[in-house]
Amino acid sequence: MNKSLIFLLSFAYSCYSTKTENNFDINDVENKACQYGCGFENVRRTSFRKTYDILYTCSECSTLFDLCIKYRTCQDGCVPEMPVLPYDQAKDVSARIRPPMNPCLDLVTACNYESMDSYEILRSENPFLYI
């Protein structure tokens, strides 16, 4: 029992230390991508590959990061890639579950080992407010 607890704690610490040693700004990644327009999706994907690899070492972050990247796309003259949760479905889900359905906010909380309640002040009825 003690060995498994030590293993879990050391794994959590290694995920955390990897994340903090290679600090990244997801807004910076998004801005670099969007200044060229949506036609540069491959450039954008390449630009955050290193960040993605870092987050992928912590499996609970990787899925959220994928969702976040899908939603954080260029807003003007672009159709965001949204195969995961179209607007109508997001609106329906947010009506049943406490809002917002925001994968970027989920990413922040999960990867900082914090509760969603820590960010209650940021919540809104509009699930796309923070995109």
From Swiss-Prot:
Keywords linked to the UniProt accession: Developmental protein, Differentiation, Signal, Spermatogenesis
Signal peptide: 1-17
GO BP term, pick one: spermatid development
Role this protein plays: Required for spermiogenesis.
Name under which the protein is recorded: Spermatocyte protein spe-27
Native species: Caenorhabditis elegans
